[in-house]
Amino acid sequence: MECALDAQSLISISLRKIHSSRTQRGGIKLHKNLLVSYVLRNARQLYLSERYAELYRRQQQQQQQQPPHHQHQHLAYAAPGMPASAADFGPLQLGGGGDAEAREPVARHQLHQLHQLHQLHLQQQLHQHQHPAPRGCTAAAPVAVAGAPAGCAGALSELPGCAALQPPHGAPHRGQHLEPLQPGPAPLPPPAPAALCPRDPRVPAACSAPSVLPGAAPSTVAASSPPASTAPSSSTGFYRGAYPAPSDFGVHCSSQTTVLDLDTHVVTTVENGYLHQDCCASAHCPCCGQGAPGPGLASAAGCKRKYYPGQEEEDDEEDAGDLGAEPPGGTPFAPCKRARFEDFCPDSSPDASNISNLISIFGSGFSGLVSRQPDSSEQPPPLNGQLCAKQALASLGAWTRAIVAF
């Protein structure tokens, strides 16, 4: 209890200092007030911990003095989800004094009722383990499905335990012969991304049509396939054709981030930490094929454009039109903004000199944060140096401001 007394003295000193600061002319400063509040909080925590530790020691001493049968009966009164240490701080022990002795018969009666409820709960759990309901449901399900008409399927679907026993979409209807269940081959795993959406632009229909197994019956295919009007919205191939998955582009083209520069109103698309047009210029980029980008990808190579406040609806319509049609001379490509280099003038950026200074200061460590190029053996042929410098300056605007702000 010596630590508790020290904590009490700290509390009294802190309270006196806070109270005296109201009457003084200058008062105590803000950092001193915060320091006093911090000391006050720590002292309170220490006092409470010492208080509860003392109560716990008293409880342990009382349990050691009690007979073992009474101690076991007290531990059995604890709730199922409550630990034994939490049961120690009951109303009998925390109250203390003659008041607790006066309430002892009532508390014992309440604990006895809790014990009976706990025993009843355990008996119900044991009964459920001995007589599980799903077994009887599954045992009676084949007879009900085989002998009942087709209208009983709705009644079975209302039962929560038999929800998994409903026949699938491709199951035979009423009047057809029910074949016995045979251990057939396991269902095939979902095909690879290349099988879902092939890279050949001559077969665009395969991306939106569901894949059909060679040995499947026509009736099963007709029953399992959704209507033609909902096929684009329900099939994953349609979305893979419009928005290619990260695995289609390779490892280094997996993420895409669009950054809006609030000062210059420039929208910059950064993929996995570097500009996508730098990736497209690479001769070994898997998302653009082997070689330089063709004329079909010229409209999708640039990712920077001017941003105006009233241009969202017009841009959405243009993007919707770009998604509907594939590039005539290339493979399906990620939806990227059109190149508008004529609208963008990097010389008008107010912090171009600051950006160049930051680039020279940070050096390769800062350039590695924005552009992550391949190995030296896979470097593309050098492009126009002035254009690359302008693109780098424009893309570094938001990054440098964020670093300077922090």
From Swiss-Prot:
Pfam families: IER. Residues 182-193 have a biased composition (Pro residues). Residues 166-195, 216-235 are annotated as: Disordered. It comes from the Eukaryota. InterPro entries: IER. Belongs to the IER family. PANTHER family: IMMEDIATE EARLY RESPONSE GENE. This is Immediate early response gene 5-like protein. It comes from Mus musculus. The lineage of its organism: Eukaryota, Metazoa, Chordata, Craniata, Vertebrata.
